[in-house]
Regions:
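Coupling and communication elements adjacent to P-loop NTPase active sites across diverse families
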Residues: 1-54, 66
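ABC ATP-binding cassette signature C-motif
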Residues: 38-242
Length: 242
């Protein structure tokens, strides 16, 4: 009997917390993003792409990204998802096959690892060439404490560092947004804000995220990466070879 009452109390407490969170979400100032319009149809394309670090992570991947795509790159850990994103933003990644971007394509990239951040957010805004006022406004919408603005980012929590990277990306006007595990260490309120933003603004995006609900709510295209064979699916199935 006592155990049943204890369980009931925990359930009531969890329900109250959820209701309170939903009220906070409704009151929260909405995030905004201003993507650049793309002049053509094709943003990026991969054909027979293979990535190998001594041994192949995957082979023969083909896909394309178009204006309006919010594509989730999915697959098991270590299968090469982050390597594809890094290759697409111009980093050196050992590969064969073709991965091309539209000429003049502007990309905004949020890497998975934020440990490199250091200095104050003011210094960071200056280095990145973004509007400091807008940057700070977005951080505050993420419930980022003002007291942190003057502190060294090296001492930030993982969630605070990820919010810095996301806020910087939201400040940037780009044709394509590439985000690697954007929800890592992020609180629930900020997660819902991001989900709502992407559902209403619909920027062209390629992202990696292990949160299945976020993928289901956000993506209109899924590139499923497997070692053998790669495949592409989506709400409107498209040929994998473009």
């Amino acid at each position: 009997m006592k155990r049943a009452k204890s369980i009931e109390k925990r359930q009531e407490k969890a329900l109250a917390q959820k209701e309170g969170l939903l009220k906070n979400i409704e009151k929260a100032d909405e995030l905004r993003i201003t993507p650049l319009p793309w002049r053509g149809r094709l943003l990026a394309e991969a054909r027979e792409l293979s990535i190998s670090y001594g041994k192949p992570l995957f082979e023969g991947l083909s896909f394309f990204l178009e204006e309006g795509d919010r594509a989730a790159l999915t697959g098991p850990n270590g299968c090469g998802k982050s390597s594809i994103l890094r290759l697409l933003v111009g980093e050196e990644v050992p590969h064969t096959g073709m991965l091309s971007r539209g000429r003049g394509l502007i990309v905004s990239y949020v890497p998975q690892d934020a440990s490199f951040l250091s200095g104050t957010v003011q210094d960071y805004a200056l280095r990145e060439g973004i509007d400091r006022s807008l940057f700070f406004t977005i951080l505050r919408k993420f419930d980022f404490p003002r007291s942190q603005f003057e502190k060294d980012m090296a001492g930030y929590s993982g969630g605070q560092k990820k919010k810095v990277l996301l806020a910087r990306s939201l400040c940037e006007r780009a044709h394509l947004y590439i985000w690697d595990e954007p929800l890592n260490f992020i609180d629930l309120l900020s997660r819902v804000q991001i989900e709502r933003l992407l559902g209403t603004a619909s920027p062209a995006m390629l992202f990696v995220e292990h949160d299945r609900r976020f993928v289901e709510q956000t993506a209109n295209k899924v590139i499923a990466l497997r070692t053998q064979p790669p495949a592409e699916t989506g709400k409107d199935p498209l040929p994998a070879n473009g």
